[in-house]
Amino acid sequence: MKKNNNGKLRIIPLGGLEQIGMNITAFEYEDSIVVVDCGLSFPEDDMLGIDLVIPDVTYLKDNIDKVKGFVITHGHEDHIGALPYVLREVNVPIYATKLTIGLIDNKLKEHNLLRSTKRKVIKHGQSINLGCFRIEFIKTNHSIQDASALAIYSPAGIVIHTGDFKVDYTPVFGDAIDLQRFAEIGKKGVLALMCDSTNAERKGFTMSERTVGKTFDNIFAEHRNTRIIIATFASNVDRVQQIINSAYKYGRKVAVEGRSMVNVIGTAAELGYLQIPDKTLVDIDQIKNYPDDKVVLITTGSQGESMAALSRMAANIHKKVTIKPNDTIIFSSNPIPGNEKAVSKVINELSRKGADVIFQDAHVSGHACQEEIKLIYSLVKPKYSIPVHGEYRHLKAQAGLARDLGIPKENIFIMHSGDVMELNDESAEITGKVHTGAILVDGLGVGDVGNIVLRDRQHLAEDGIMIVVLTLEKYSNQLLAGPDTVSYTHLRAHETR
């Protein structure tokens, strides 16, 4: 791309549009680039052997001298999960709120990047200067604490990026969304609004997180004599807090299972975002020392992930927890689009084992519905609308809301990943495209697996056989030879992985 010297701001989404996940957007003005979020997405069903998917950041690598930093809206995987991979090639400072930095630090430790990466904690209401940009962090509500919207000030004008948000007047922890600040910035004149589209098809308002706490209380009261197992997102600290509150109220000990759940709860408690009464939390190995009616287990696996703790319990391969008849199992989440089949499979397996599975009324969304989106538009009064965070139908639904609120059709842009939008107060247009794409992470390999290998893995899964040959001593079972493997399939040897 040519150097931007025409007084226009460039907005370049490198992922996160027309999909759920892999959120990352570059904002460029002259010789400054600021990157908002750096998330991953999870593999599709046909991506055999793939652990996760990260965005192709070739554009950032090609313009590394301009990149001033990553600004992160909140600590969900689809907004921070790609950082350990991208930082190896684009190592610039990270700016985020306290809990978000804490969760990022966990990832950087796992990848031995903590010492080599600069991080700075920003409070809501504070601003940072990065090159030509000033970026203000605004308090919002979401299904994880410390979520932020961003007011991005540039010489071309102000852009507000909502991040993932909802309007919750009675949050479990902290303050409600700072609607007053949205209105104050709106009075200054906002060039563009980039707003969360996830629930743009849903009418009304999203319910408060506190309503789930009432549901938990009712379930605990109705199931006093059974063990309770609750699966939810590891990062939903408010949800975990309400589970702990109900467990304490009804005299139950709480155990946690799943590596990500243990890490998040540990970080949140250490930073003061989770209040755990003394002697309430016990190690998973200790639950056998308590009657079933005195135990609550919080676990990962709400999305049916094959290797998550609840899925392993359902398949009878979990080393520490065996599902018992009459266990009460609560799915405190909705399936992410694409995960419905996997979740249904786990529910069926649990039901076959005699468990009472509850998956209704135990979850509320962390994303704004139509009336909340319209409220933000009314406060901000943007000249241009750029729907973000969602599949195409979600982006289109928000575009319709923007039109209903009086924004001209020509000022509404449904962008695609890689589009280059140039805008100022006089005009806005899509002027080009940069290279984007998805990079597949397979174990320790990043970008090593392509479509040909995925196709051949599919062939192997459907039409292949592998034989393992070994020789054992008859009486002692001592290995004498091998193991050797023989495979029969259509794969070409140099493409087999």
Model-derived features with residue positions:
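His/Asp/Glu-rich metal-coordinating catalytic cores
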Residues: 2-71, 76-289, 308-322, 341-344
